[in-house]
Regions:
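Conserved N-terminal/central alpha/beta ligand/cofactor-binding core
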Residues: 48-52, 137-222, 226-227
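Extreme N-terminal leader/targeting segments of oxidoreductases
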Residues: 2-95
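Short acidic, glycine/serine/threonine-rich loops at helix termini
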Residues: 132-137, 171-172, 233-243
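A conserved short coil-to-beta-strand element within the FAD-binding core of flavoproteins
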Residues: 37-42, 224-239
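Short, well-ordered alpha-helices that flank and scaffold nucleotide-derived cofactor binding pockets
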Residues: 24, 111, 115, 213
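N-terminal Rossmann-like FAD-binding beta1-loop-alpha1 element of flavoenzymes
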Residues: 92-128
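Core beta-strand elements of the Rossmann-like FAD/NAD(P) dinucleotide-binding domain
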Residues: 93, 247-256, 260
């Protein structure tokens, strides 16, 4: 698989134009391109009289990739695939790991642990997305704040109501894993290649709900309106957490706590 960077095309260009430009960059007949996938698409509008699209693409070609690379310029490189595979954990404890918070970190921790078969218990002080949306609407319309379920607390975390702009200043290759999981759970497909990916608050609610459903389907449990008030520690080891849920108090036994 080869990656071609910075293919510049007019705003009127279509998929065939992109394939032809990719063939030109590789210095081979476009018919030798078996597959082409856009990994980034941006608009260059620095010159108002010359606005164009800029693409990065990954292509699978018919031929010797090393030979093709030798005759191409610096804009072509071999794709460095980074697949996120959680390390194998040989866990002997029969206690469920507890995740505190169901924002972005809690959701992806829950997904990873549930897929690994650990059936995590997730505690979230706020409400699930359906009730949380009602609480937020009440605050915006009537200025009545629910201190436990609002734009900050609740399923999905603060990002659920931040319009879903996916920007980061880091180049961590695992960002691709996050983007793909969001798309797999209902976010627009174009976030996979857009230079400024954007989900939108309406679609984010669906994504968050679908992640919750997968975790539960794999044996995980999510307790909403349930606040962790303390960690139980004895002899330097975690033995559990203390929780409060609508005036009811419970000690949950665990030896693993993720503060998310």
């Amino acid at each position: 698989m080869l990656k071609i960077n910075q293919i510049k095309l007019p705003l009127t260009a279509d998929e065939h134009d992109l394939r032809r430009a990719a063939g030109k960059a590789l210095r081979l007949d476009e018919n030798r391109i078996r597959t082409l996938r856009v990994t980034k698409k941006a608009v260059d509008s620095r010159k108002k009289d010359n606005i164009f699209f800029v693409y990065n693409v990954e292509v699978d070609v018919d031929g010797d990739e090393n030979a093709i690379l030798k005759r191409c310029g610096s804009g072509v490189e071999t794709v460095k695939k980074v697949d996120f595979t959680p390390p194998e954990v040989k866990r002997t404890s029969e206690l469920r790991p507890v995740i505190v918070g169901f924002g972005p970190a809690g959701m992806f921790s829950g997904l990873a642990l549930a897929r690994a078969g650990f059936k995590p218990l997730i505690l979230e002080r706020g409400s699930h997305i359906e009730d949380r949306q009602k609480d937020v609407q009440t605050f915006w319309r009537e200025r009545r704040l629910n201190p436990e379920s609002n734009v900050q607390f609740g399923e999905g975390g603060a990002g659920t109501f931040s319009d879903g702009k996916l920007t980061t200043g880091i180049k961590d290759p695992l960002c691709r894993f996050v983007i793909d999981e969001l798309a797999n759970h209902g976010a627009p497909e174009e976030i996979r290649w857009s230079a400024k990916p954007h989900i939108g608050t309406d679609r984010l609610a669906e994504v968050v709900r679908n992640i919750r459903k997968e975790i539960i389907s794999l044996g995980g449990e999510i307790r909403f309106n349930c606040k962790m008030t303390d960690i139980i520690v004895a002899n330097g080891y975690i033995h559990g957490v203390k929780t409060e849920n609508d005036g009811h108090f419970e000690d949950i036994e665990t030896d693993t706590v993720l503060l998310c």
